């Protein structure tokens, strides 16, 4: 059996808590809006690529989002999305 047949378990480090992720995303969202960007597409671009250029320095947004692991942000987004769909 090849390793492609086995399911790998992914664990996210417990560095940031839910409030940190929510607060950071809210601040980044506001900064993107203020600069005239589409916040959703810019955040998605950042999460998919890891390129901080998707997030402006305005209101320290780039620094704020850079303090969080992208996998932790994605985990929080999926958790909230699925909990609202139950």
UniProtKB/Swiss-Prot annotation:
InterPro entries: IreB (IPR009309). Transmembrane segments: none annotated. HAMAP family: UPF0297. Coiled coil: none annotated. It comes from Brevibacillus brevis (strain 47 / JCM 6285 / NBRC 100599). Belongs to the UPF0297 family. This is UPF0297 protein BBR47_19030.
């Amino acid at each position: 059996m090849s390793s492609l047949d086995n399911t790998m378990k992914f664990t996210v480090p417990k560095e940031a808590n839910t409030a940190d992720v929510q607060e950071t995303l809210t601040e980044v969202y506001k900064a993107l809006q203020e600069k005239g960007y589409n916040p959703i597409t810019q955040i998605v671009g950042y999460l998919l690529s890891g390129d901080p250029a998707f997030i402006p320095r305005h209101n320290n947004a780039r620094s704020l989002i850079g303090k969080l692991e992208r996998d932790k942000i994605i985990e929080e987004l999926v958790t909230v999305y699925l909990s609202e769909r139950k």
